[in-house]
Structure formats: C-alpha cells, structure tokens
Amino acid sequence: MEKGEVASLRCRLLLLLLLLTLPPTHQGRTLRHIDPIQSAQDSPAKYLSNGPGQEPVTVLTIDLTKISKPSSSFEFRTWDPEGVIFYGDTNTEDDWFMLGLRDGQLEIQLHNLWARLTVGFGPRLNDGRWHPVELKMNGDSLLLWVDGKEMLCLRQVSASLADHPQLSMRIALGGLLLPTSKLRFPLVPALDGCIRRDIWLGHQAQLSTSARTSLGNCDVDLQPGLFFPPGTHAEFSLQDIPQPHTDPWTFSLELGFKLVDGAGRLLTLGTGTNSSWLTLHLQDQTVVLSSEAEPKLALPLAVGLPLQLKLDVFKVALSQGPKMEVLSTSLLRLASLWRLWSHPQGHLSLGALPGEDSSASFCLSDLWVQGQRLDIDKALSRSQDIWTHSCPQSPSNDTHTSH
C-alpha cells in the first residue's frame, strides 16, 4: 500500500472514531474479536459516570492498524442533559476530539491540525429512554443514525497525515484527559447515563478481573430526579447559593421528595466547627427538625408535596401543604444563624455527614433555594455515588447500598 493511501486510511479511521461512542471498560483490559450479535445480547449495561470531576470511567489505548470493521452500534440512555460520552486523542495538544451531550443534544468537538470545529445535532436524547445509535462508513462519508433515522453526514476532508506517525489512540469513556478549560466550549464532564449492546468496529472491550463491577443505575427502572443512596452527601457553601433577603431577613428552601426510605440525616445548616446548627432528620416517614438545645419538631412526610423550610427574624417554620410546625427561638440564637452566611465555612449539606452511619435514601424532584433551583453540579463537594439526574422508580434492595 502506498504511503498516501495509508495516510488516507488513517484519516478515515480518525474521523470514524470521532463519531463513535465506545464501550465503558477499565484499564488493564484487553480487546478480542467476538461475534457482534452475541456481544450485543450478552454484555450488561455499563454506567458512564465516575463521580464528580472529569475523571473517565476507563482509558483505552487503540491500535489503529488492527481495526477490522468500519461500523459500530450501541444503545444509551440518560436523563442528564450535559456530559462527556467519550474523549479521544493521539496527543492532547493538537489532535483530540470529544462526543458528549449539551442541552440534551449530541455534540462533537474536534481540534487538530486540519480542523477545529464544534457541531451540535439531533433531537434531545436525555429522556430516560434507550436510544440506538449506529455509525457506518459509506464511500467518502460517515453516516450517523439515531433511533433508526439519519442525523449526520460528514464528508471526508483531504488531509495528509504523512508527518503524523502515531498509529495509536487513547479513548477515555465518561471523562476527559485534558483540562475542561481546553475544550472549545467547556461543559460539565460527568454524565449520569448508561451504554449497552455496544459493538465497536467489530470488537468489544472485556472487563479485567480487577475492574469495578458496579452497574450504577443501569439495572433498575428510572425516573428523573436527584437520588441520594444511604450514606451519601453533597455540600454547598452558603456563599455560593442564593442569599437571604435582608429587609426583613428571610431565607427559604424547598425540597420536592419523590421517595424516601430508611432513617438518617436529610439536611444540615452549619459550619466547620458547628456542623449542625439546624438539622432535618428522617425517621419513620417523619421529618424531625432540631436546633441544638431547642425542642424538636416532627412533621409527617407526604411524598409528592414540597417540603418547605423558612427562617426569619422570629422563627423557623417547617411546612408541607396545609401542615406546619413552628420553632420559636431567642433572638440570640437567630443572630448566630444569620452569621452562618458570613462565616467562611458556612454550609448547606444534603444527606449524611461524611463518615456518618445512615440508612436514609431519598429522591428529590427539585431543590429550590430562595426561589431558585440549586444545581447539584455546583456543589462544593459530593459523594461519588449520588445519581445526579435519575432516581429509581421505587425503593429496593438495589438502592440500599452505595454503588
């Protein structure tokens, strides 16, 4: 084969991988050729997220000289509108690409010596359904189908790779191998989603014996929401969330519970030295409000109605629908509460405190602070096992332990 033909083939393979979502695996795994039909039916769905941040689920090194089949297919589902499906490169400086979601639509970002582009296309796919995706090479074009419909056609671009001797490529699933800031249009990398029935250029990746076996939320029926398995937590700095009104001083938050189970901490307002100035606990389907030495309040929890917590200069009120419980406290105690917002370690925490034993799990449809929706991706810190955009349809043994 002539040198120019080899370069052209390598260019096509790079563009092919540009549009290809790869199967999630782990480092240390090897590739083997298998029957595609058997692969698609036998392999379990795999979870894409590796927690907050940009760390990928796995990183693969691909030998571009051993690609055996120029077509690929897979199914994926998510309620998450934004995140990385996969990132690939031969080097992070001038030859990388990314396939992900933004506002629920597929997006490709490409950066190399011949092209720098960003393309968003197709319908919104973050509807919780399994969407089949197929990629084929047709003459000089690459075709992409979603749900059996052609969504994208890229014509080949003539570019010589004669001075680009690398024949291997890194593929990172569910994350990035370069800083998020180096993307042409940065996004939140973590994606709460799953892939199944994936065939990759006639091959399928096999998990190593030491690979993490968690399926995340891929083996249960889902609904949209924010799910905290037992023992998980998320922490927001009070300086980073909507601030209290000042005249008069008031602060409110609202939690829309879709399901709750177990017993333990739901919410905390405090600081690093006093981690629980005000706390909401779940016990026997009842929310218990406590504030240090003050008497406790209990409110039976009705799933489906928003739970509201309101603070002002005279009281703390907990309500749900027509039911309300009020905790009257001293001005001295309330003054210390107001100072939480000026304290550098003032925080709002959801779920169990770090290291705390808790069996409570819950799903939130919404989390509002001062009338504004709070984004879990903006948390100061959060547990790896939180499902950021999905919840189980009902409590089950599968969700009583962290993944």
Curated annotation (Swiss-Prot):
GO terms for cellular component: extracellular space. Keywords: Disulfide bond, Glycoprotein, Lipid-binding, Repeat, Secreted, Signal, Steroid-binding. Residues 46-218, 225-391 form the Laminin G-like domain. Glycans are attached at residues 274, 397. GO terms for molecular function: steroid binding. Its main location: secreted. Disulfide bonds join 194-218, 363-391. Residues 1-30 form the signal peptide. Pfam families: Laminin_G_1. SMART domains: LamG. PROSITE patterns: LAM_G_DOMAIN (PS50025). One of its GO terms (biological process) is primary spermatocyte growth. Isoform 2 is only expressed in the liver. It is found in: Secreted. Gene3D superfamilies: 2.60.120.200. Functions as an androgen transport protein, but may also be involved in receptor mediated processes. Each dimer binds one molecule of steroid. Specific for 5-alpha-dihydrotestosterone, testosterone, and 17-beta-estradiol. Regulates the plasma metabolic clearance rate of steroid hormones by controlling their plasma concentration. A putative trans-splicing which involves HDC and SHBG gene regions produces a fusion protein expressed in fetal liver. Homodimer. This is Sex hormone-binding globulin. It comes from Rattus norvegicus.
